[in-house]
């Protein structure tokens, strides 16, 4: 496992620093905006119902696949979530397709929290975690390819991600008529902070 370090003196600067959300070994937290909300953190099983509700509420937009509550409960710790005033407003799942390829799944930002960069911050954190876990690439299947391209992903033919096809696509009724783009991001392995990642491979 690659390890390394994680991501004075006037009093005002020191006082502001103490108000920031603490970064712990179990989850890297981030804040957005001067009010320090929303906050990004690793999800826990206690978040499963809120994650399920957020995904279900946005399925009608046509960009998400349904996820059962049982599935989310089983994989809750793979999610990164954004919390705004005690309300879960964004999430995404980091799923292992193979020992070398991970996938961004169920990326959704509630309409009330959009245009704040939350989606990009969540994807960046998932990419960081995938890199630490030893994956060589991060992929996604999406209707919004341009969104991912702006984050450094490349559009590729679906067969270039055979792990996804074997894991999910062949069982999909739209397999031969898929309207999604396949995008992929190579992960350069560098110095990263340690985060617990056992759940990604189990």
Language-model-detected regions and their locations in the chain:
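Short, P/G- and charge-enriched loop/turn segments at secondary-structure junctions
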Residues: 67-69, 167-173
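Short amphipathic alpha-helix that is part of the acyltransferase structural core
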Residues: 25-66, 83, 180-182, 189-202
């Amino acid at each position: 496992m690659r390890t390394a370090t994680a991501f004075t003196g006037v009093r005002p600067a020191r006082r502001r620093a103490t108000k920031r959300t603490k970064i712990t070994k179990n989850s890297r937290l981030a804040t957005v905006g001067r009010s320090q909300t929303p906050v990004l953190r690793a999800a826990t099983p206690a978040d499963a119902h809120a994650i399920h509700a957020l995904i279900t509420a946005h399925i009608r937009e046509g960009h998400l696949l349904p996820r059962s509550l049982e599935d989310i409960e089983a994989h809750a710790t793979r999610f990164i979530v954004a919390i705004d005033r005690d309300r879960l407003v964004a999430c995404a799942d980091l799923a292992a397709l193979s020992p070398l390829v991970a996938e961004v799944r169920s990326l959704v930002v509630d309409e009330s929290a959009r245009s704040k960069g939350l989606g990009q911050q969540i994807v960046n954190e998932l990419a960081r975690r995938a890199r630490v876990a030893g994956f060589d690439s991060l992929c996604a299947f999406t209707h919004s390819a341009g969104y991912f391209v702006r984050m450094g992903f490349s559009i590729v033919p679906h067969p270039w991600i055979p792990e996804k096809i074997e894991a999910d696509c062949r069982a999909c009724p739209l397999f031969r008529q898929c309207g999604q783009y396949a995008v992929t991001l190579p992960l350069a392995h560098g110095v990263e902070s340690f985060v617990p990642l056992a759940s990604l491979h189990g």
